[in-house]
Amino acid sequence: MAGKRKTIEEIASEYLEGDNLRNFVDFYDFMKNNGLTVTKPSKILRGGWKIAYEGKKIGGFKIWEKNFWFCGVEIYKNLTDAETYEKYITAEQKQFLLDNFRTTPPCCKGKDNFEFFGKTYNTVCTCWPHFQGNPEGEALENAKQLILVNKKVVADIAAAN
């Protein structure tokens, strides 16, 4: 019989320490306090979890290895539509996204011809743009605010339908 699956809190305590653990706990508490759900999407995404609102994926995070984690926001067409998305995002948040937008090596079969704020990218990671490892300070706050932007966009799209 398989053992009990570890909770996110148990995994974080096992893998992270010091400021990295404190920052992750802060981020995880932020998600819980903002009505977001966190689920393990598949066995393929080792160490990764999906952040969702109203059943729509709006971000994710990974506890990747010993004392290393990262988070990101979901980028897909209905969240980046300029008329919808940009009315919620500040110029600084937009720049933060652009500065942290990552493409993937061609071997990962990322998405080609992906338009993001007027620029076309090739080999875009089909997961989500992730921010530097072990986010803290301004980077962590930007990640939180962008997740809230995605939550608001999802709510507005649902309200319009």
What does each of the following model-derived ranges do?
Residues 13-38:
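Short N-terminal edge-element motif at the start of the domain
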